[in-house]
Amino acid sequence: EIFYNYNNKTELFGDIYQKSKEETAMVQLIVGKKGKGKTKQLLDKVNGAIKAAEGNIVYLDKSSKHMYELNNKVRLIDVSGYPIKNADEFIGFVCGIVSQDHDLQEMYLDSFLKNAKLEGKDITDALHQLKEISEAYKINFVLSVSMDKEEIPAEFQDDIIIAL
């Protein structure tokens, strides 16, 4: 339990915040081939989430092109500026972000295959790792993945929230 003292009132916030974070901890997928509108869906979702967010929101992208389409409360990180060579390094990069922000509630990963260096490769291990991170740190991940619904591994079919 975490108590905060504010204006001589001691209030319990920790349990309430932790409970609401636990309810949202998951990995969600927006899928569809390149050019189908996944990024627009992701931007709409992140900007809509700002109103209800109790913690911080991070948006990872392959460039800073969408900077002005994001609410200024969302932290945009241009992944192309970092020397990431493979999926393991990308997951390490995500863990680094998680470790530096204890109030992180949601991460939006645009161009997931490109940023995670998984184009043309199996995404199963990376999705499992993101699920583990999500459960361990109570962070909701929303990914845009340039694959058709049928190409997504069977065990992650239930995580698809939008198929274009």
Residue positions per predicted region:
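Short amphipathic alpha-helical segments, especially helix-boundary/capping motifs
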Residues: E23, M67-N72, D103-Y108
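Conserved P-loop
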Residues: M26-G96, I152-A154
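Sequence-level detector for tyrosine residue identity
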Residues: Y4-N8, Y17, Y59, Y68, ...
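Compositionally biased, low-structure terminal segments
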Residues: Y4, G14, F90-I91, V142
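Short loop/turn elements that form and flank the Walker-type P-loop nucleotide-binding site
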Residues: A53-E54, L70-N72, D101-D103, A136-K138
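Short, Lys/Arg-enriched N-terminal segments with co-localized hydrophobic residues
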Residues: E1-A25
